[in-house]
Amino acid sequence: MAQEDMFNMDAWNRLYDRMRSGAEYADTPMPQSLFDSWPITVDGEVNSPYTALLPDLVKEAEAAGVTVTKVSKEVCNWNGTGAGSVSNVEITGIPVSWLIERAGGYADNADINGVRVMRADGSSKRAMPLDKVDGGEAFLVYKINGEQLTAANGFPCTNWCEGVDPEVNSKQMNEYKVVTDAPDFDDHVYEFEHHDGNPNGWIDADGNWTNKPNATVLGVPEGLVIQNGQPYTFHGYVDAYDEKIASVEFSMDFGKTWTKHDLGDTDVNKLVWFDFTWTPQEESAYCLQLRATTESGLVSPQIQTVMVNAKDAMPAADETVVIDTPSLVAPKTAAAEVAEGKE
């Protein structure tokens, strides 16, 4: 997946969000001087707090052979059933555990329970679990797909914590603070309501999951016309944030029967993509439904339904309507505006 195809939340009205959005929309690259002068601080409950420039840390980490390049997922906490706020990309970064070791390691304090990621504009200070940091699943990322980050993806750097929702993946972060006040990472309701940690899914008013696990078909507009008698492939993904996907199921009869596919040992740090190929046998409308299960037994709380129309004769180009505006309401013409003004 290319960087420009990654989802991002630059609709937030934060200082650096506005700068990133403006640069992205104007196709203006971020200045290299921002990377060259970007400070990273590691402090809090460590033995030797320090501040170092990002390029110096990169050079030192690369020389030490500790940088990591790997494929990793990012799935928005808000990502609903049928939505596409997901990314699967190659990241290159410095393990946060190495950055802490560079600070002399953790201080002798039994109450240490997390690492806060401090965003440079002060708008976020979410905490990561120690097991993610110590387990080599938290990174200071400075490249995606072998290239420096785009403006929308947080140039010059972003935090990246694997196997959790990306609300802790603060863009343009400048400080890792080892703390004793991190939340209970098993209390997803508290994390959700207090904007801390990793809720790992969206919850309703009763604290129930609404999008975990999530089984989604992508790129099929409602009522898509397909050729009868010819195979058609539905493409999509299944994910459950911090839980492994165990199976995915498909139904063509509105849930009366399900065809189950066991997935074996999946990687919680990567998206599970699928292709479901099916051949209609007669001209008609058809609906596909899908759901997923996790290792712990969670079942998709919401089920996506996509409808296609199988036709023996596909419509010609002049028999179709092409909507060339993203708006649901057609834009006014100059003549229409003049006519309205005369009323």
Model-derived features: positions:
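Extended, aromatic/histidine-rich regions of cofactor-dependent oxidoreductases associated
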Residues: 1-41, 46-52, 101-343
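Acidic/histidine-rich, surface-exposed loop or edge segments in extracytoplasmic proteins
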Residues: 38, 67-82
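Surface-exposed, glycine/proline- and aromatic-rich loop segments on solvent-exposed faces
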Residues: 41-43, 50-72
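Second-shell loop/turn segments in exported
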Residues: 43, 77-89
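Stable alpha-helical elements in mature extracytoplasmic
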Residues: 50-60, 92-95, 99, 169
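Catalytic-loop motifs flanking and including active-site residues across diverse enzymes
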Residues: 72, 92-95, 155
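Extended catalytic/binding region for NAD+/ADP-ribose chemistry, centered on the ART fold
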Residues: 86-93, 159
